[in-house]
Design a protein with these regions (language model features):
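Catalytic and substrate-binding clefts that recognize carbohydrates or anionic sugar/phosphate headgroups
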Residues: 1-35
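Carbohydrate-binding surfaces of carbohydrate-active enzymes
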Residues: 30-43, 48-143, 148-562
Length: 562
């Protein structure tokens, strides 16, 4: 494949992402260019994987045999046969796993190591890659997700004209792959390519940007980047140079004068969302081998794209369980086989390099490596809460798989305690792992732990005003309300009941607050406003004047209605 939209001097074939030698040759000119500039660039960036059909590398067969234990050349007829059958699917699964391993170790991790040798950090968009997204995102210092198009919100008055939008791909489950990778691997920053194609050029309002930004922050992003801020020289004909993909954040756009208000809001949110550590209590296993074992209509090379979620995410037990956990009020991070292998148990808590968790849920899946199953049993015996929605039916891959299946059956027979509960939520409650029932009001939230206290980011994307006492799953606390838009703050009215603190909130549609728990009230009381129900109609004519814009201004006008 040729490089898309190449910069000057950058045209030609794309890099071989599965070859250490290719990466070494690729970075050689940059070694010279960055001499004396080590540490002077904060981070280098790798965009989403948009290299299509890169299904081979010169030493692939040798790497495959080393990793999978058999000679793929002897199975090419099954590999390339597009028939949906067990042995062909197993060989395709091995092929896809090998591509994933090579991408992770030959490029992504090696690229980050090279950047560290220059004292740079790395930002990586792993989506679109033909590999395990969790492991790939986690290989970078700053995992980065992407929003594309416009998402629907119930906020009254929010304009979403069909002719000006592209339907959005910012599914909360997809967004959580990047933040989960950051959380379980101990990376504090999660970035995003934000507002890509939110509306057509010059048709985006800041009010339309705000809920989109809120949705990604609610799913773990705390380091927003714009898409895009286009350079445009003074000599350019009005309205200046434009990037093909909107939004156009620059001085030629009418929203530019008021954009600082949006930027201030995002900055205030991120300053709190970067403090402390994530406070998600549940881990959810991503059974990627079920995706790799899928025939995919005979397609050998398979990419996990954000624009084709129906091919690999929608309709899976993993997706459904994630949505159900979110709906119930549980905070969840995803985990891969690799990170399960690194997990430990301390006093019943699952410990990873990035944090601690109260439970690990395994959604119903067909294929699971023996090593993963054995590790889960080990964690359970050590006191961890491991909940199986369904037990695996087989092992992945082709090499000696029938023997592997027998071993799997024996392990399951020897561990009859691995029963699947009828209701995972009752199983969680039995472990005293309770959800945040505030979601029953329609409010959305994300929670962080800052020095033992909880910080909640709460957003009202409903069409209703929420005016009630909202329960927080923390006992005997005072609560500080902070408004990130106006910078107002004060201590809320609270009622303390058992292990719950009830907080008085009044939130209009589209409004967002931070709630910070504390042992003793530290600030003045929060001001609660109440409407007196009166309305004041505005009558008469309006003088409409156009004082800015170009290249020509419309004529002034007098209108009777707005």
């Amino acid at each position: 494949q040729q490089v898309k939209r190449a910069a000057p001097g950058g045209s030609g074939y794309t890099l071989d992402h599965y070859s250490a030698e290719a990466l070494k040759a690729y970075v050689a000119p940059f070694n010279d260019a960055f001499k004396g500039r080590e540490g002077k660039i904060r981070a280098i960036f790798n965009d989403s994987f948009e290299v299509y059909g890169t299904d081979f590398t010169p030493n692939f067969f040798e790497e495959f045999k080393k990793l999978r234990g058999y000679d793929l050349k002897n199975q090419l007829s099954l590999l390339l046969n597009e028939t949906d059958n067990e042995e062909g699917n197993r060989i395709r699964s091995d092929y896809r796993q090998t591509i994933s391993d090579l991408l992770l170790h030959k490029f992504d991790k090696s690229w980050t190591n090279w950047a560290h040798s220059k004292n740079f950090k790395t930002k990586l968009q792993a989506h679109g890659s033909p590999g395990n997204l969790i492991d790939l995102y986690a290989s970078a210092d700053i995992p980065e997700c992407e929003t594309f198009g416009s998402m629907p919100f119930d906020i009254p008055g929010l304009r979403r004209d069909k002719e000006d939008i592209r339907e959005g791909d910012a599914d909360p489950v997809m967004l959580k792959f990047s933040s989960s990778a950051a959380h379980i691997s101990g990376k504090n920053l999660v970035s995003s390519e934000t507002f890509t194609w939110l509306r057509e050029h010059f048709k985006t309002a800041l009010s339309q940007c705000k809920p989109e930004a809120e949705d990604i922050m609610l799913n773990g992003v705390n380091h927003i980047f714009l898409h895009g801020s286009t350079y445009s020289p003074d000599r350019a004909v009005w309205p200046g140079w434009q990037f093909y993909a909107s939004v156009n954040f620059n001085s030629n756009n009418t929203i530019w004068e008021d954009a600082p208000s949006l930027f201030s809001y995002i900055s205030n949110c991120q300053s709190l969302l970067q403090q402390g550590k994530p406070d998600n209590e549940i881990l959810l296993y991503w059974p990627i081998f079920d995706a790799w074992d899928n025939c995919q209509k005979g397609t050998l090379f398979f990419q996990f794209k954000i624009h084709s979620l129906s091919e690999w995410l929608y309709g899976t037990s993993f997706y459904d369980t994630t949505k159900n956990l979110i709906k119930k009020g549980y905070s969840t991070d995803f985990i891969s086989d690799h990170f399960i292998a690194e997990a430990k148990v301390v006093n019943g808590t699952i410990i990873l390099s990035g944090g601690s968790y109260k439970s690990l849920i395994v959604p119903a899946c067909k294929k699971m490596p023996l090593e993963t199953l054995q590790k889960l049993i080990e964690l359970k015996k050590a006191g961890a809460s491991i909940i199986f929605e369904g037990l695996p039916e087989s092992v992945p891959g082709f090499n000696d798989y029938k023997n592997g299946e027998q071993n799997l059956k024996k392990i399951l027979a020897d561990n009859v305690s691995l029963i699947t509960p009828e209701d995972i939520f009752k199983a969680l409650e039995n472990k005293n792992i309770k959800p945040e029932s505030l979601v029953n009001t329609g409010l959305k939230f994300i929670r962080r732990d800052v020095d033992g206290e909880k910080v909640y980011y709460i957003v009202n994307h409903t069409k209703e005003t929420i005016d009630d006492f909202i329960p927080l799953q923390i006992a005997n606390r005072e609560v500080l309300i902070l408004n990130p838009l106006t910078k107002e703050f004060g201590n809320a009215m609270v009622t303390k009941k058992d292990q719950t603190t009830l907080v008085k909130l009044k939130m209009e549609p589209g409004q967002a607050f931070f709630l910070k728990t504390e042992k003793i009230a530290s600030q003045k009381k929060w001001t609660y406003y109440k409407s007196d129900g009166k309305s004041f109609p505005l009558k008469g004519n309006w003088n409409l004047t156009f004082d800015k814009g170009g290249p020509k201004l419309p004529q002034n006008d007098v209108v009777s209605t707005l």
